[in-house]
């Protein structure tokens, strides 16, 4: 049985059609879908449009920070927040009670609040029953008048066309379908958690369900229903419009898109993951063929089955002439977002919060400049010959370590650069079954770097351990092992408490690179079967080394005897978000392989000769070294120590001791946020640590300029630091290149924290406590929930949502030219997703971007552009 016939909507004869691969991947001509009334519904084109409003978050292993509201980037920031709130049912700003608490704590000052009120006006408060004559009365009204909390209303998925099944027919389809659909998806996409993998994994999702229905001894409800058999044999381009015509009504094709959007947003996590894997199938190590079209087809079939069970096969459509017209969708041009009074007040508080931080941040930098120019500074001696130079990732967590390291010796210099250090590659360690990407997400690397283990006995030992692990999970051998060696598991449990790194669930970037293995970075001209080149040519290496040195301004400084590239990673146990704690510029991987590779490149004599022809001279007395900093344990791992010349051994030992002291001070500084910690507890005695670190929490600013702007200045681990010498960039080309790389990465980190803190349940993942890992691709609440996107509250609870304050050291003319070099950069600053400022350091003038110009800030003025 299929959908019942009617005089107006004839049912086409079912056909067995194998669904084609996604048009985005195969490049095939798109199939259009014919509705029962003869009109055409372009399913694939429609789903491509709708996918824009879904979360764009890949599997856990590739967790990369991004702008949560990327789909609204074309709108000004505040308008985007309002539109997204109406679409997803999320908070637009923090609750008013939270802002009032921040005000009482001094995080919002009267000065900042007064400036915001004078600029934005407050007369509208009188119209809402709070008569005010000056800014103080307006402040008092904001503190005392009951405006509400600004609690968001329901999203489009809870009050749209599809929700009429519940509101008008009394059907709760979600509760009946979601658990079955999610289990099906989890089983099909599983990447190694399930002991028994999904059969027929080479098939597409729809073909997989067909095969199960036809061959399984047990019914796969609801898809095994006789009513759905004809629909199950159709391609999605046929079945989807056929079912929608019954649900929405024939001739109502404009509403098909709306129904599909509401259905996808009802489980946005799974929908977004399916779309990500459709356009990026390489995101799974064990690839699967999934598509939004097949997901929609399966869910609509399930809905149709349950609707027919409850209402019969003849039922009225959800929309008809007697139904009220549906309002425009929040992302459509005709939709006009109107803030509530509570949201208007919250916007004033939010602007005052950002202005308070901005005034404090800029004031510290100007005070630091005054001290430096007075000659009383002891932390920065520009005429002092460098003894050691260390390159760090521009990551905000590395700023405090750089400061503590520089404090050990005025001749120690540090530089900030994107943590992949220009080495765009995939990396495959000695124990890795698959290579992993180690460069920014938008790049498509063509080079592979491998490790080769020097000791073959370790390979044999690793293989034996893997075999024992597999055998322990089989029926017979697992039973024998548990009966004979089961007691050992209790001993291992106790050991894992006192030494957590023994836990098999531990993830550590220090173990990602085998310091005892050899790494080869040089290659010939042969390309491997999978399309990667095994290493780099000398010319390619020279390009990458020169790129780092030139962009950082080091070509204008003499090179020290020892130059260290310090990547960063992390270590944690049973943490699904381990990739979020590693280097974002390395696609959520530790930066150790990149640091090691660029050091090996810079030490090659052939590369140095090529660099010398380009004017980048590396003296023979200079040696490069790679290292990795574990930001959670504050430990350092060095690579290729056996290759360090004897002439540099004493200096290396001095540097290692300096780093040990710096990391001890850094760990102490990190602990200051734990208000109840006892100063008498030794870190080695604190074996229980519920939060390995706060990651990028509290990030708020980014400086692109010389180190002398902030050397010796504590920026509270809230600032990204990228090295740049404006004197070497008269045309702004280097700055434009840096901005194009830094703004999406740092801005994405900032905004993901912003929105995950703003609404921990819609934009964030909520508390980690009920989380379970689903198939190694995502996390869910409980056992049958939607995939959760964004960040958990344990990573954001100390974060204040502030838009990134980006300050570049450059003249206003060049700063403006650089940021207008690409349409994406213009979108970031013109729509107020970040705050863009420049500092003419010599003249001590600061400027802010406002509507295509750089406007000078008056002394003492905080911020002006509000987005």
Over which residues does each language-model region extend?
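Structural beta-strand/beta-sheet cores of well-ordered domains, especially the beta-sheet scaffolds
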Residues: 387-389, 416-418, 559-562, 594, ...
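Long, charge-dense tracts
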Residues: 12-454
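Catalytic or ion-translocation cores adjacent to nucleophile or general acid/base/metal-coordination motifs
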Residues: 410-460, 520-562, 569-653, 714-715, ...
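Generic recognition of flexible, low-complexity loop/linker segments
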Residues: 367-381, 549-554, 561, 685-692, ...
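Gly/Ser/Thr-rich loops at beta-strand to alpha-helix junctions
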Residues: 394-400, 565-573
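Active-site cores of enzymes that catalyze phosphoryl transfer or operate on phosphate-rich substrates
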Residues: 453-555
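Hydrophobic alpha-helical scaffolding
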Residues: 347, 351, 391, 395, ...
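Long, compositionally biased intrinsically disordered regions
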Residues: 23-225, 230-233, 646-867
């Amino acid at each position: 049985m299929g959908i019942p016939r009617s005089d107006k909507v004839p049912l086409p004869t079912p056909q067995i059609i194998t669904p084609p691969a996604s048009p985005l991947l195969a490049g095939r001509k798109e199939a259009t879908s014919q509705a029962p009334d003869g009109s055409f519904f372009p399913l694939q084109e429609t789903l491509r449009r709708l996918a824009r409003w879904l979360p764009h978050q890949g599997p856990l292993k590739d967790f990369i920070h991004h702008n949560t509201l990327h789909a609204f980037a074309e709108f000004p920031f505040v308008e985007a927040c309002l539109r997204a709130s109406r679409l997803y049912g999320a908070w637009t700003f923090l609750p008013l009670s939270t802002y009032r608490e921040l005000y009482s704590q001094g995080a919002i000052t009267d000065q900042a609040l007064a400036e915001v009120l004078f600029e934005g006006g407050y007369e509208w408060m009188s119209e809402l029953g709070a008569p005010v004559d000056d800014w103080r009365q307006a402040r008092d009204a904001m503190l005392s008048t009951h405006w509400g909390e600004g609690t968001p209303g329901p999203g489009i998925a809870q009050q749209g066309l599809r929700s009429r099944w519940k509101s008008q027919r009394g059907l709760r389809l979600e509760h009946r379908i979601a658990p079955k659909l999610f289990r099906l998806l989890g089983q099909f996409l599983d990447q190694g958690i399930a002991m028994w993998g999904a059969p027929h994994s080479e098939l597409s999702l729809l073909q997989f369900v067909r095969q199960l229905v036809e061959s399984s001894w047990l019914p796969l409800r609801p898809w095994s229903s006789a009513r759905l058999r004809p629909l199950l044999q159709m391609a999605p381009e046929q079945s989807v419009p056929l079912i929608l015509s019954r649900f929405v009504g024939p001739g109502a094709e404009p509403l098909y898109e709306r129904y599909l959007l509401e259905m996808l947003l009802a489980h946005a996590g799974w929908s977004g993951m399916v779309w990500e894997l459709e356009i990026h199938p390489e995101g799974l190590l064990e690839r699967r063929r999934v598509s939004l079209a097949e997901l929609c087809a399966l869910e609509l079939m399930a809905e149709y089955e349950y609707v027919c069970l409850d209402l019969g096969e003849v039922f009225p459509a959800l929309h008809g002439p007697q139904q009220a017209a549906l309002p425009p969708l929040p992302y459509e041009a005709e939709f006009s977002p109107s803030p509530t009074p509570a949201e208007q007040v919250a916007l004033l508080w939010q602007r005052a919060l950002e202005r308070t931080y901005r005034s404090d941040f800029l004031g510290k930098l100007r005070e630091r400049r005054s001290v430096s120019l007075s000659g009383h500074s002891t932390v920065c001696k520009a005429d002092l010959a460098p003894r050691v130079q260390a390159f760090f990732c521009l990551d905000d967590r590395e700023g405090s370590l750089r400061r503590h390291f520089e404090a050990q010796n005025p001749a120690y210099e540090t530089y900030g650069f994107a943590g992949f250090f220009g080495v765009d590659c995939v990396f495959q360690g000695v124990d890795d079954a698959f290579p992993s990407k180690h460069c920014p997400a938008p790049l498509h690397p063509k080079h592979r770097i491998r490790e080769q283990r020097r000791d073959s006995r370790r390979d044999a030992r690793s293989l034996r351990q893997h075999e024992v692990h597999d055998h322990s999970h089989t029926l017979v051998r697992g039973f024998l092992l548990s009966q004979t060696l089961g007691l050992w598991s209790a001993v291992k449990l106790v050991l894992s408490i006192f030494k957590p790194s023994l836990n098999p669930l531990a993830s550590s970037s220090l173990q990602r690179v085998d310091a005892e293995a050899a790494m080869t970075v040089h290659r010939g001209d042969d390309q491997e079967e999978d399309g990667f080149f095994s290493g780099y040519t000398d010319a390619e290496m020279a390009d990458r080394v020169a790129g780092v040195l030139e962009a950082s301004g080091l070509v204008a400084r003499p090179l020290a005897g020892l130059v260290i590239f310090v990547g960063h990673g992390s270590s944690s146990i049973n943490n699904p978000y381990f990739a979020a704690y590693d280097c974002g510029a390395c696609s959520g991987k530790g930066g150790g392989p990149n640091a090691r590779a660029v050091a090996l490149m810079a030490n090659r004599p052939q590369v140095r000769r090529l660099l010398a022809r380009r004017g980048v001279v590396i003296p023979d007395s200079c040696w490069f070294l790679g290292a990795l900093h574990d930001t959670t344990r504050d430990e350092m791992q060095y690579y290729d120590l056996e290759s360090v010349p004897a002439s540099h051994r004493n200096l290396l030992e001095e540097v290692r001791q300096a780093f040990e002291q710096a990391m001890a001070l850094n760990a102490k500084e990190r602990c200051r946020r734990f208000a109840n910690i006892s100063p008498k507890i030794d870190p080695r005695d604190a074996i229980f640590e519920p939060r390995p670190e706060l990651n990028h929490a509290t990030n708020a600013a980014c400086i692109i300029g010389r180190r002398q702007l902030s050397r010796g200045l504590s920026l509270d681990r809230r600032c990204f630091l990228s090295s740049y010498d404006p004197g070497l960039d008269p045309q702004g080309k280097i700055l434009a290149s840096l901005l194009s790389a830094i703004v999406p990465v740092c801005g994405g980190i900032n905004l993901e924290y912003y929105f995950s803190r703003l609404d921990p349940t819609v934009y964030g993942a909520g508390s980690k406590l009920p989380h379970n890992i689903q198939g190694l691709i995502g996390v869910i609440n409980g056992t049958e929930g939607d995939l959760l996107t964004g960040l958990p509250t344990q990573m954001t609870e100390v974060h204040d949502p502030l838009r990134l304050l980006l300050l570049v050291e450059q003249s206003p003319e060049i700063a403006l030219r650089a940021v207008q070099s690409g349409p994406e950069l213009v979108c970031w600053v013109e729509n107020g997703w970040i705050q863009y400022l420049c500092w003419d350091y010599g003249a001590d003038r600061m400027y802010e971007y406002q509507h295509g110009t750089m406007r000078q800030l008056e002394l003492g003025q905080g911020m002006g552009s509000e987005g």
